[in-house]
A protein has these predicted regions:
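Sec-dependent N-terminal signal peptides
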Residues: 6-14
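C-terminal segment of classical bacterial N-terminal signal peptides
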Residues: 14-21
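Generic beta-strand structural signal
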Residues: 68-70, 88-89, 138, 166, ...
């Protein structure tokens, strides 16, 4: 009899947990996530960000600088063997340049620029997502390398789809999987986040991205010369 009661209690607890998980909504998960990373008000104060990083490739350290001016420009710059390459995205245009095989920047296809517009958003897709025109669906619980995560599906106005995995215990972002279509082909990109750090501005930020990119320092709301987002002629 005791065994039967214990079994019933165990099953009840298990079912209660599952019902509780299913009962949660996307907005519930988003609210807890935003609270965990410093709160939406602190993130909305950020208008510019410059990240000085190191990317490891075949045992070699590659300096990387990522600069974002909220809603205006994104620039990814890396230096290998004395050659500096970059990719620039603005609200309407984009360019890429690799001095090893180009004499001048190449304009990015219109579709590529459209799909990359979310890079101009420092806040990310979960803050004011409805106002941004995003649609988010809660897909329940999933496992990411042993970590129980809440799974959210984000559909952006550009047509890009992103699946977001949020740690069910601390509500930090663990992984994103982006899906886009280019030239009729579906492409997927997985990004993993870690080493969350409290910054003076009141936000919590992942200093490790994808296991290969480490952020050494972050400059927030420092003056950014907008000319770095223009194509050099």
């Amino acid at each position: 009899m005791r065994f039967l009661k214990s079994a019933i209690i165990a099953v009840t607890v298990l079912l209660t947990g599952r019902v509780s998980a299913c009962a949660q909504t996307a907005d519930d998960i988003i609210a807890r996530h935003l609270a965990a990373i410093g709160g939406a008000p602190n993130w909305k104060k950020i208008t510019g960000m410059k990240k000085n990083c190191i990317r490891m490739s075949r045992g070699v350290e590659i300096p990387v600088t990522i600069t974002v001016l909220q809603g205006k420009g994104y620039r990814y710059e890396s230096t290998i063997g004395g050659f500096t390459s970059y990719t620039i995205i603005t609200g309407t245009e984009g360019w890429s340049f690799n001095p090893r095989n180009q004499q001048k920047p190449d304009a990015l296809p219109t579709e590529s620029v459209k799909l990359a517009q979310d890079r101009l958003d420092i806040q990310g897709p979960l803050i004011d997502y409805k106002e941004k025109g995003y649609k988010i669906t809660y897909l329940g619980i999933d496992d990411v390398e042993g970590t129980e995560c809440h799974k959210l599906k984000v559909v952006m106005p550009s047509g890009k789809e992103e699946t977001i995995f949020i740690d069910a215990s601390n509500y930090y972002l663990v992984r994103t999987v982006e899906k886009t279509k280019a030239n009729g082909k579906e492409q997927s990109q997985t990004t993993t986040y870690g080493d969350y750090t409290n910054l003076p501005e009141g936000i919590v930020y992942p200093m490790s991205v994808d296991g290969g990119l480490t952020i050494k320092s972050i400059e927030i709301n420092k003056p950014i010369d907008e000319s770095i987002f223009a194509m050099k002629k």
